[in-house]
A protein has these predicted regions:
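A metal-dependent hydrolase metal-coordination microenvironment
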Residues: 33-165, 171, 180, 193, ...
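Short acidic/histidine-rich active-site segments
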Residues: 219-235
């Protein structure tokens, strides 16, 4: 019996040594798969009459209101998607996560500004005054203190923004209403100079009536995401290669330059390969984007030349007939 016990013990000991030797020969870990490469997707745009065409989103949310992401992620998304500037515009009145992240309305901006500086993204300080219609939701951009907008009376909140030199934008005028209307309060705000711009595109909606108001009232045009989710979860980039954005014709790539351009109404709206704006600006973008070669071959009836799009804006030819000033009847 003793002999059997010794043999069994010896066998177990030998097996343990073999297993230890085999384990020592194995690598500690084997990596399978790779992390997604985080690269910036540039959108080439032309310079126009000395103005830089900057790519901006002036309406995004974070966990500091009813968004689901941290402010730094908004900056990282903007960098990857080729933007130059974003405005974090968390709701003043609606902060479901307030008990977890704190009550200060300046927190999101303060948290994101270092990441923005590191990635060369212009970060605009703002907040969304969120009331039922009328007046609806209004973004106050370029404010110094977002906490000052936390007022029970919405007119006091808008006045507080105006006193800080803010640019005030009416958000998604057609969202959540039976009919889109320019109310008396909007006329009052407009006459006071407290309503400076309007979203004609928001998330997945564009508002033709709002475009008419912008032309009639000479308001600045905006197209923004109003993103609460992760951008890549919100938009199917198989349908489009860019998020909705506001293109700003700025004198320079600075926050002050953008602010000046907004008050001067030098903006275009770009969404789903559609470029929207005032005719004179659209014409300038079109002309600055195209390079036309000299005529390189001629016949009695035809002239041959090349037209090159030097930007990443897609242009579709609706009519391939070109007319020259000296031969308007030639085709």
């Amino acid at each position: 019996m003793k002999k059997t016990k010794v043999l069994v013990f010896a066998a177990l000991l030998t097996g343990g040594v073999c297993m230890q030797a085999q384990e020592a020969a194995l690598p500690k870990q084997i990596k399978i798969g790779k992390e997604r490469v985080k690269a910036r997707r540039e959108l080439r745009l032309p310079e126009i009459d000395g103005y830089q065409l900057l790519k901006c989103d002036f309406h995004v949310h974070t966990i500091f209101s009813d968004g689901i992401v941290w402010p730094t992620l908004r900056v990282q998304e903007a960098w990857e998607e080729g933007l130059d500037a974003i405005a974090i515009t968390d709701h003043i009145e609606g902060q479901p996560a307030r008990q977890h992240v704190g009550k200060g309305h300046n927190n999101a901006f303060d948290m994101a500004k270092e990441e923005a500086a590191r990635r060369n993204i212009i970060l605009v300080k703002g907040g969304e005054i969120t009331r039922s219609m009328p007046p609806g939701h209004l973004n106050a951009l370029f404010v110094e203190d977002v906490d000052a907008l936390d007022q029970p009376d919405y007119m006091k909140a808008i006045e507080a923004a105006h006193k800080q030199g803010a640019f005030i934008q009416w958000n998604h005028p057609g969202w959540g209403v039976d009919s889109i209307m320019w109310h008396d309060v909007h006329e009052d705000l407009y006459r006071k100079g407290w309503l400076n711009g309007i979203e004609v595109y928001n998330e997945f909606e564009w508002y033709p009536v709002a475009l008419g108001w912008a032309n009639e009232k000479d308001l600045t045009l905006f197209g923004n995401t109003d993103v609460h989710d992760v951008v890549e979860r919100l938009y199917d980039f198989r349908q489009t290669d860019h998020r909705p954005m506001t293109l700003v014709l700025s004198k320079d790539r600075t926050s002050d330059g953008i602010k000046e351009a907004l008050f001067a109404r030098r903006t275009l709206v770009y969404f789903y390969d559609t470029l929207m704006g005032r005719e004179e600006l659209l014409q300038k973008v079109f002309e600055a984007s195209l390079r036309v070669s000299p005529v390189y071959y001629s016949t009695d009836k035809r002239r041959y030349l090349q037209i090159e799009n030097t930007s990443d804006l897609p242009f579709r030819l609706c009519n391939c007939l070109l007319y020259t000033s000296d031969a308007a009847d030639e085709r």
